[in-house]
UniProtKB/Swiss-Prot annotation:
Region listing for Disordered, in residue ranges: 38-72
Biased composition (Basic residues): 57-69
Keyword set, alphabetical order: Isopeptide bond, Phosphoprotein, Repeat, Ubl conjugation, WD repeat, Williams-Beuren syndrome
GO MF terms held by the record: phosphoprotein binding; protein kinase binding; RNA binding; translation initiation factor binding
One term under GO cellular component: endoplasmic reticulum
Gene name linked to the record: TBL2
Keyword Iron: no
Cross-link for Glycyl lysine isopeptide (Lys-Gly) (interchain with G-Cter in SUMO2), residue positions: 168
Top-rank taxon: Eukaryota
Protein name per UniProt: Transducin beta-like protein 2
Length: 447
């Protein structure tokens, strides 16, 4: 046989062999498919030890194969001084505000809702809330109007201010209606704070650059303030409604007065005074309820309490009353600060923990660790000073203000020693006994 004929025969043999292998593989694949159809599971899963599924039908097969998306677990926290946890939001809460009449707490979250909670339910098992929906957006900041008949929010995507009116229904609930038009867009950087003067004369918005805007209630910009602080970290309207303050990269807090005429017309914004004494950037500040005290917290590791009841027009500067130290959590967001209405207690939030200080002695009295699953976004005392509220995940947590009750005991004991009038002594003794009984019920009465 010639060499060429032998080569042709060998090639034919190889071709036939390949065809045979392909046929065998096809038969094997068909057998595997048949096995999968009979069992309802892939054959490889049988080999790995999964029991055969005796159920039939494509619906159950799809349910088995569908990957379920697990919801993030709610952070659990317990403490003997925890008064309540408000948990109706399905998204992270970024801001909250107590109404001036003390009846409500407003919260906003990235779940496109604002919740209005009844404060009288705080110590009940059930915590009722009313819901206002934010169409096609969500609110990052919320503030009640002075008359508690409306609230304003800052829209995350719209970058503007929206007003919601609250209309009371016959059943005692409220209907929430957004005004037809939002405020015009004016800020060029993200807005970090908003506020309304309790006089009802102006609204304040502050962005993370150096801009603070003063608005009329109708959405007209009355004044633009350049804080010259490199960047703003916090801004607020004083409870008295006269002042606007800001802090930022510089080691001071700047305060302006928003001036109006006798007929209520806007006149000007003038520099009032500054809080000077920190050696590094100021994270945050807060006013007491009467605006006569302010507190500040800085990157330098200190907090300070100030007497701001001064005649600034006569060039009188605020007085430093107390300086305290704190340890800032490593890698945490800038500290949040809240001052009790009577300025006797200062609360600092660093990371997910809260520290409470007696401002007269400068001593830390309480510490709540890992309160939220994320860094605390907002911190606030209610207007009575009974509770401290915090938010940082999908819940608001409310704490009994035991340092406030202890400060009340110390104050009443001091007044009793100096009181000469019997009726005054009886009134002071009644307040002292009430504060002591509250501490005793909370297991926080010091012997």
């Amino acid at each position: 046989m010639e060499l060429s004929q032998m080569s042709e025969l060998m090639g034919l043999s190889v071709l036939l062999g390949l065809l045979a292998l392909m046929a065998t593989a096809a038969v094997a694949r068909g057998w595997l498919r048949a096995g999968e159809e009979r069992s309802g599971r892939p054959a490889c899963q049988k080999a790995n030890g999964f029991p055969p599924d005796k159920s039939s039908g494509s619906k159950k097969q799809k349910q088995y194969q569908r990957i379920r998306k697990e919801k993030p677990q709610q952070h659990n926290f317990t403490h003997r001084l925890l008064a309540a946890a408000l948990k109706s939001h399905s998204g992270n809460i970024s801001c909250m505000d107590f109404s001036s009449n003390g009846k409500y707490l407003a919260t906003c979250a990235d779940d496109r809702t604002i919740r209005i909670w009844s404060t009288k339910d705080f110590l009940q098992r059930e915590h009722r809330s009313m819901r206002a929906n934010v169409e096609l957006d969500h609110a990052t900041l919320v503030r009640f109007s002075p008359d508690c008949r409306a609230f304003i929010v800052w829209l995350a995507n719209g970058d503007t201010l929206r007003v919601f009116k609250m209309t009371k229904r016959e059943d005692g609930g409220y209907t929430f209606t957004a005004t037809p038009e939002d405020f015009p867009k004016k800020h060029k950087a993200p807005v970090i704070d908003i506020g309304i003067a309790n006089t009802g004369k102006f609204i304040m918005t502050a962005s993370s650059d150096t801009t603070v805007l003063i608005w009329s209630l109708k959405g007209q910009v009355l004044s633009t303030i350049n804080t010259n602080q490199m960047n703003n970290t916090h801004a607020a309207v004083s409870p008295c409604g006269r002042f606007v303050a800001s802090c930022g990269f510089t080691p001071d807090v700047k305060v302006w007065e928003v001036c109006f005429g006798k007929k209520g017309e806007f006149q000007e914004v003038v520099r009032a005074f500054e809080l000077k004494g920190h050696s590094a950037a100021v994270h945050s500040f807060a006013f007491s309820n009467d605006s006569r005290r302010m507190a500040s917290v800085s990157k330098d590791g200190t907090w300070k309490l100030w007497d701001t009841d001064v005649e600034y027009k006569k060039k009188q500067d605020p007085y430093l009353l107390k300086t305290g130290r704190f340890e800032e959590a490593a890698g945490a967001a800038p500290c949040r600060l809240a001052l009790s209405p009577n300025a006797q207690v200062l609360a600092l939030a660093s990371g997910s923990s809260i520290h409470l200080y007696n401002t007269r002695r400068g001593e830390k009295e309480e510490c709540f660790e890992r309160v939220h699953g994320e860094c605390i976004a907002n911190l606030s005392f209610d207007i009575t000073g009974r509770f401290l509220a915090s938010c940082g995940d999908r819940a608001v947590r409310l704490f009994h203000n035991t340092p406030g009750h202890r400060a009340m005991v110390e104050e009443m004991q001091g007044h009793l020693k100096r009181a000469s009038n019997e009726s005054t002594r009886q009134r002071l003794q009644q307040q002292l006994t009430q504060a002591q009984e509250t501490l005793k019920s909370l297991g926080a009465l010091k012997k």
